[in-house]
Amino acid sequence: TSVDPGSYVPSHWHRAVEIIYMLEGELEVTVERTSRILLTGQCILINSNVIHSTKCTHPNRAIVLQIPIEFMETYIPEVSQLLFLWNPETQDPIMRTKLDRMKDTLTQMQIANDIRPEGFLLRFNSLLFELLFQLYHNFSVQVLKPNVNQKNKDLSRLDPVLTYTARN
């Protein structure tokens, strides 16, 4: 569980899918220049290599999970050609059920990590694979390969610049 008394995380990206599930409070999330306020009970997914930032002006508590794309590549065929999408405000009962199930999986992962009972890694990893299945089965969309590859190539060119900037 992430407890944030107030912070700003500037624009960045990483080679991981990031999920933020707000347990209490609110968080401003900007994804590729589109900002939205994430409220208690809402969940957002940020795809790998997508530029994003967060701003917390009031204390909040959230589950924040990053799944490295290299890990996902081992288990999800051609994951680099997929986007994971959902509308956190959907009124579609089937999608609401899928989102609620995913939130429950995230909550169970957090409980296993917080309590750490004997064999907790078995429990946590089984839930992680359940989450991967849910993402792949319920929320993935195939994208055109050239667009993904060009975007990744463009971002990889920026890596040395950002590394240099961070060091200096």
Residue ranges and their predicted role:
Residues 102, 106-109, 124, 131:
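Amphipathic alpha-helices that form helix-helix packing interfaces
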Residues 89-98, 113-124, 133-168:
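Short, Lys/Arg-enriched, Trp-marked, Pro/Gly-tolerant hinge/linker segments that flank
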Residues 25, 131-134:
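Hydrophobic alpha-helical transmembrane segments of multipass integral membrane proteins
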Residues 18, 112, 130:
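Acidic-residue sensor for enzyme active/binding pockets
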Residues 79-104:
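Aromatic/histidine-rich interaction motifs
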Residues 2-86, 115-122:
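N-terminal regulatory/effector-sensing and dimerization cores
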